[in-house]
A protein has these predicted regions:
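Glycine-rich phosphate-binding loops of nucleotide-dependent enzymes
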Residues: 2-200
């Protein structure tokens, strides 16, 4: 039997009088791909926004089964969903930092563990051992994912200078840098050609 990773029950999201999600229930299994399919405006992105803490759902529940814990995603503030629950996402419209390098975009994704290692103090600037070790680890993780998508040679280039398909791949591996327990991809193949879609 497949282990459940995510349980969403009676999820509702209202914006004033507009009902964006109406009593949605579904589950996702561990190590499986689950798709949310619907026309434009059906609320697919809103579901991801609720799962990742960008929106607080009006009603319903969202539970993530992580190791020996059952985490209530509604209890986490937005950035804590990624940090504590291990939920990462990509966006329908690519959201990179275009003036930052390709490598820096991947390092930014790992800022929570770097901040934790510095003790949220200035010690990180003075080469505190834990910070330096975590920084090296973050660079190695970034290099690993750049190698996977074939962009190691572009590591120092501005992310905004990459072709569209490479930007899409970079956004996906940026989410992978935190080793997510749940990865939400919002129209990940949008704008990709057939070859790029197959690679994805």
């Amino acid at each position: 039997m497949t282990e459940k990773l995510l349980d969403v029950e009676n999820l509702t999201m209202k914006f004033g009088g507009l009902v964006a999600i109406d009593n949605l229930s579904f589950s996702a299994a561990k190590d499986q791909i689950t798709s949310i399919i619907g026309p434009n405006g059906a609320g697919k992105t809103t579901v991801f926004n609720c799962l990742t803490g960008f929106y607080k759902a009006t009603a319903g529940s969202m539970f993530l089964n992580k190791e020996n814990e059952r985490l209530n995603l509604k209890r986490f503030s937005d950035f804590k969903v990624a940090q504590k629950a291990g939920v990462a996402r990509t966006f329908q419209n690519i959201r990179l930092f275009p003036q930052m390098s390709v490598l820096e975009n991947l390092m930014v994704a790992q800022h929570n563990k770097l901040m934790d290692a510095s003790g949220f103090t200035i010690l990180g600037l003075f080469n505190a051992r834990s910070f330096v070790n975590k920084e090296k680890e973050a660079v190695e993780i970034s290099k690993y994912w750049l190698d996977i998508i074939g962009l190691t040679h572009r590591a120092d280039d501005d992310a905004g200078d990459l072709p569209y398909g490479d930007q899409r791949k970079l956004e996906i591996v940026r989410a992978m840098c935190i080793n997510p327990h749940l990865l939400c991809l919002d129209e990940p193949a949008a704008g990709l050609n057939a070859k790029e879609s197959a690679e994805l």
